[in-house]
Swiss-Prot record:
Chain residues that bind UDP-alpha-D-glucose: 139, 339, 354, 358-359, 362, 378-379
Protein's recorded name: UDP-glycosyltransferase 74G1
Organism: Stevia rebaudiana
E.C. number(s) listed in UniProt: 2.4.1.-
The entry's keywords: Glycosyltransferase, Transferase
């Protein structure tokens, strides 16, 4: 039985993620935790996202109710709209969400709180119109949120100097900050304004949530708690990979991409323990042919087994000589995989990652050493966290043209797979894996914050 917390009434929460896989997953996992505490949970996603998911998902979030609203791009979703998407989503989504709330209320359904993606701050305005408490959910690291907040408040000036400081975190070099802060000339773009707009009305939110855990960013979290009612509720992975307290919770259950699952698992089963380098850069990264060539050569030169996720549309960039390596069984190329199952497999010894925060948390939670190869957004800061602060990986630097060269990448892979520093990194990875599990266990820091939120919800 999944753990159940006895409460006097069953409150109802709407969860509204931004319609990207990396944002939807944390919301779903948080929803499952809330349900285990006796809270009724409804996920509100876009019509396009829901339709896309039904095509690929083999599992369902049976315990979470699903509702859909329009983002104004019901056919093509956010990828079809470009920079106009954010404004379209705000205008159309606000009305569609209001209509949904009216519909639910007319059916006798109460809504006690709306927890929304920080990237859709306009949801809070809708919630306030209906007298409903709101909570902003940040899917990025606390330190990244702090950097954006300090810029928003004018406490950090742009363009940046050579170094940047925020409370509770070691000094960052300019190149270690989120990319949008480095390229300040792009600061007026809609996506940039959205990042700073996360804080426009946040003081009106009753709660602020973050997908992190206390030991991971202890001092930054303590500072953040001085300004907001912060609930630290991560890592938001399926329970099977952490505390195993939720029955049959093995998958996010809301997949936008079709995974080559059995092919991956069968291939990994034939490989020795910690012998495979897993290479994946998330759903949004698109490498040019030159970078794909450099990654290929690095993997071949490293003489390791490798599993590389590269989307069908990108396969044409793969060099012809790679097919010979694939035929030997030393490498496997797939369009998508169930990353958690791959990282949890004993044959995987290293993760070459773009350092999106979901992938960052997954690597930490499953104890897999990383080669950090950040691409954009917050990933440069996450890479610093993994390498310099946690000691669970090593950063590979790009050249002046933004290309990571084969020699640098191969050197980092060998460092983790073969050298003494790799042994130290692996020990650190095990330590942080254990700390992540403790956080979500009963009485752990994240579990306590969820219990506290439920208590506050009931008293509303």
């Amino acid at each position: 039985m999944a753990e159940q917390q006895k409460i006097k009434k069953s409150p109802h929460v709407l969860l509204i993620p931004f319609p990207l896989q990396g944002h939807i997953n944390p919301f779903i996992q948080f929803g499952k935790r809330l349900i285990s505490k006796g809270v009724k949970t409804t996920l509100v996603t876009t019509i396009h996202t829901l339709n896309s998911t039904l095509n690929h998902s083999n599992t369902t979030t049976t315990s979470i109710e699903i509702q859909a609203i329009s983002d104004g791009c019901d056919e093509g979703g956010f990828m079809s709209a470009g920079e106009s998407y954010l404004e379209t989503f705000k205008q159309v989504g606000s009305k569609s969400l209001a209509d949904l709330i009216k519909k639910l209320q007319s059916e006798g359904t109460t809504i006690d709180a709306i927890i929304y993606d920080s990237m859709t701050e306009w949801v809070l305005d809708v919630a306030i119109e209906f007298g409903i408490d709101g909570g902003s959910f940040f899917t990025q690291a606390c330190v990244v949120n702090s950097l954006y907040y300090h810029v928003h408040k004018g406490l950090i000036s742009l363009p940046l100097g050579e170094t940047v400081s925020v409370p509770g975190f070691p000094v960052l070099q300019r190149w270690e900050t989120p990319l949008i802060l480095q390229n300040h000339e792009q600061i007026q773009s809609p996506w940039s304004q959205m990042l700073f707009g996360q804080f426009a009305n946040i003081d009106q939110a009753r709660w602020v949530f973050t997908n992190s855990f206390y030991k991971l960013e202890e001092e930054v979290i303590e500072w953040t708690r001085k300004i907001w009612n912060l609930k630290v509720i991560g890592p938001t992975l399926p329970s099977m990979y952490l505390d195993k307290r939720l029955d049959d919770d093995k998958d996010n259950g809301f997949n936008l991409y079709k995974a080559n699952h059995h092919e991956c698992m069968n291939w990994l089963d034939d490989k020795p323990k910690e012998s495979v380098v897993y290479v994946a850069f998330g759903s949004l990264v698109k490498h040019g042919p030159e970078q794909v060539e450099e990654i290929t050569r690095a993997l071949i030169d490293s003489d390791v087994n490798f599993l590389w996720v590269i989307k069908h549309k990108e396969e044409g960039k793969l060099p012809e000589n790679l097919s010979e390596v694939i035929k030997t069984g030393k490498g496997l190329i797939v369009a998508w995989c169930k990353q958690l199952d791959v990282l949890a497999h004993e044959s995987v010894g290293c993760f070459v990652t773009h350092c999106g925060f979901n992938s960052t948390l997954e690597a930490i939670s499953l104890g897999v050493p990383v080669v950090a190869m950040p691409q954009f957004s917050d990933q440069t800061t996450n890479a610093k966290l993994l390498d310099e602060i946690l000691g669970v990986g090593v950063r590979v630097k790009a050249d002046e043209n933004g290309i990571v060269r084969r020699g640098n990448l191969a050197s980092c892979i060998k460092m983790i797979m073969e050298e003494e520093r790799g042994v130290i990194i692996r020990k650190n990875a095990v330590k942080w894996k254990d700390l992540a599990k403790v956080a979500v266990h009963e009485g752990g820091s994240s579990d306590n914050d969820i219990v506290e939120f439920v208590s506050e919800l009931i008293k509303a």
